A protein has these predicted regions:
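Membrane-interface extramembranous regions
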Residues: 1-140
Length: 140
């Protein structure tokens, strides 16, 4: 089971590193416009769009590298889960691009968002594994 969880952690890391790196290059990430629009609405336009996408890129790359190398895993999972929770906000603040018929028929964007449930469960699994490993070390 340990090897499987490590594979899940590294796989999530690769995905986050990849998606994050794309955001450093304008119009390369297919999620860029969605991310910029969401951040713009969440922060009432107070954060410059270019800055917001760069900060998101840094966040995603940090999570990716943390998962790939297994460093500060508990903290990385917290950053990861915070990010994942934020990915659901377009369902509420941008329903016109998330649904064809709210709340049951998703657009491609809505499907892209909802698939993150699987990522969240993987993150919880990684976190629980980290906690269990720490308990084992303390009892030895």
């Amino acid at each position: 089971m340990e090897k499987t969880i490590k594979l899940i952690r590294v796989s999530l890391g690769i995905i986050f590193l990849w998606y994050g790196m794309l955001k450093f290059f304008p119009q390369l990430s297919p999620a860029e416009d969605l991310a910029i629009t969401t951040i713009h609405k969440l922060f009432f336009g107070l954060i410059n769009d270019t800055l917001s996408i760069k900060l998101l890129a840094i966040w995603e790359v940090t999570v990716g590298l943390g998962f790939i190398f297994g460093i500060y895993t508990r903290y990385v999972v917290v950053l990861f889960l915070a990010h994942m929770i934020c990915t659901f906000t377009p369902l509420f603040i941008l329903p016109d691009i998330s649904f064809t018929h709210a709340p049951y028929a998703f657009t491609l964007v809505g499907q892209y968002i909802v698939k993150n449930v699987v990522f969240i469960l993987a993150g919880i699994l990684i976190y629980q594994n980290e906690i269990n490993q720490r308990k084992e070390v303390k009892t030895v």
